[in-house]
Structures are given as structure tokens and as C-alpha cells.
Amino acid sequence: AGFVLKGYTKTSQ
């Protein structure tokens, strides 16, 4: 799953 937080993109699988 991918989400964007405060202009920071992180991908969690």
C-alpha cells in the first residue's frame, strides 16, 4: 500500500 504524508511518499507492502 502507498500513502502520502506531508509531501513525503512512502510505500508499505
Curated annotation (Swiss-Prot):
It is found in: Secreted. Plasma serum. Its main location: secreted. One of its GO terms (cellular component) is extracellular region. GO terms for biological process: defense response to bacterium. Keywords: Antibiotic, Antimicrobial, Secreted. Antibacterial activity against Gram-negative bacteria. This is Salmocidin-2B. It comes from Oncorhynchus mykiss (Rainbow trout).
